[in-house]
Amino acid sequence: MKVTFEQLKAAFNRVLISRGVDSETADACAEMFARTTESGVYSHGVNRFPRFIQQLENGDIIPDAQPKRITSLGAIEQWDAQRSIGNLTAKKMMDRAIELAADHGIGLVALRNANHWMRGGSYGWQAAEKGYIGICWTNSIAVMPPWGAKECRIGTNPLIVAIPSTPITMVDMSMSMFSYGMLEVNRLAGRQLPVDGGFDDEGNLTKEPGVIEKNRRILPMGYWKGSGMSIVLDMIATLLSDGASVAEVTEDNSDEYGISQIFIAIEVDKLIDGPTRDAKLQRIMDYVTSAERADENQAIRLPGHEFTTLLAENRRNGITVDDSVWAKIQAL
């Protein structure tokens, strides 16, 4: 089915208000969920909203909490989210990293005791729109087996890198081949994954999203490489924030909350003039996209460039929402 941005935001806002969230916070949170969905990231927008409400009702998320600065070391700051709303707090932390970068050339904010930030790419994009390189990542509950294991002991720990090119170039990737949100999107659409994404009941690689969801044996991106990246990203976030690791979140908490996150902004214009920056970025993009195609019908893609097209299509034609997901939200 199709809905407008206004319908989507109103539905989110209604549910948040009914759960006791104050009107200003509810409006800002509903706006972010709707913007994420409108941009085409359904897995961490509309599809994720019922799960967000579940955690709100369980007390994992404290809607009136505000992040608190703990330590300031010039370009580096350490903050405590105090289990506040994840997407609103993440936006504030990237804004703070940008402010630090404006003064120092680079800004780093390490956040502990945080909640799920929903679409991580929103915060990299936020920096790139203002002309900064944006880098951020988060740890999570253990939802992926380390390479060579059967048990989940590492997080998908998504990493975002956004570059202020025209259009914005951005990688937004979990350390698994597919996030659990994308497994859900493909399952709801009745699609197999384009490549293997995890293991079946017999321990064989499979493209069936429902089987992978059931078994909780998701495949690390690049096999041992994604597994290793997940571990070191967790270590850095834990140390810089003085926060909880994947092990602590998984073993000590009843659900995924109290996680650790990193937000970095770099002011490129302190290092290179604007025309030179733009020319260098354009040459990279032209060089990549002018390569001979393996399939004449398949264009060579640059990461993140599809979001400009998806956003325009959703604004023109309405936002696609799965019927079953919409029914869940209407019933909340």
From Swiss-Prot:
<dbReference type="Pfam" id="PF02615">
    <property type="entry name" value="Ldh_2"/>
</dbReference>
<dbReference type="InterPro" id="IPR043144">
    <property type="entry name" value="Mal/L-sulf/L-lact_DH-like_ah"/>
</dbReference>
<feature type="binding site">
    <location>
        <begin position="224"/>
        <end position="225"/>
    </location>
    <ligand>
        <name>NAD(+)</name>
    </ligand>
</feature>
<feature type="active site" description="Proton donor">
    <location>
        <position position="44"/>
    </location>
</feature>
<dbReference type="InterPro" id="IPR023689">
    <property type="entry name" value="Diketo_gul_Rdtase"/>
</dbReference>
<keyword id="KW-0963">Cytoplasm</keyword>
<dbReference type="InterPro" id="IPR003767">
    <property type="entry name" value="Malate/L-lactate_DH-like"/>
</dbReference>
<keyword id="KW-0520">NAD</keyword>
<dbReference type="InterPro" id="IPR043143">
    <property type="entry name" value="Mal/L-sulf/L-lact_DH-like_NADP"/>
</dbReference>
<protein>
    <recommendedName>
        <fullName>2,3-diketo-L-gulonate reductase</fullName>
        <ecNumber>1.1.1.130</ecNumber>
    </recommendedName>
</protein>
<dbReference type="GO" id="GO:0047559">
    <property type="term" value="F:3-dehydro-L-gulonate 2-dehydrogenase activity"/>
</dbReference>
<comment type="similarity">
    <text>Belongs to the LDH2/MDH2 oxidoreductase family. DlgD subfamily.</text>
</comment>
<feature type="binding site">
    <location>
        <begin position="168"/>
        <end position="174"/>
    </location>
    <ligand>
        <name>NAD(+)</name>
    </ligand>
</feature>
<keyword id="KW-0560">Oxidoreductase</keyword>
<feature type="binding site">
    <location>
        <begin position="304"/>
        <end position="306"/>
    </location>
    <ligand>
        <name>NAD(+)</name>
    </ligand>
</feature>
<dbReference type="GO" id="GO:0005737">
    <property type="term" value="C:cytoplasm"/>
</dbReference>
<comment type="function">
    <text>Catalyzes the reduction of 2,3-diketo-L-gulonate in the presence of NADH, to form 3-keto-L-gulonate.</text>
</comment>
<dbReference type="InterPro" id="IPR036111">
    <property type="entry name" value="Mal/L-sulfo/L-lacto_DH-like_sf"/>
</dbReference>
<comment type="subunit">
    <text>Homodimer.</text>
</comment>
<dbReference type="GO" id="GO:0070403">
    <property type="term" value="F:NAD+ binding"/>
</dbReference>
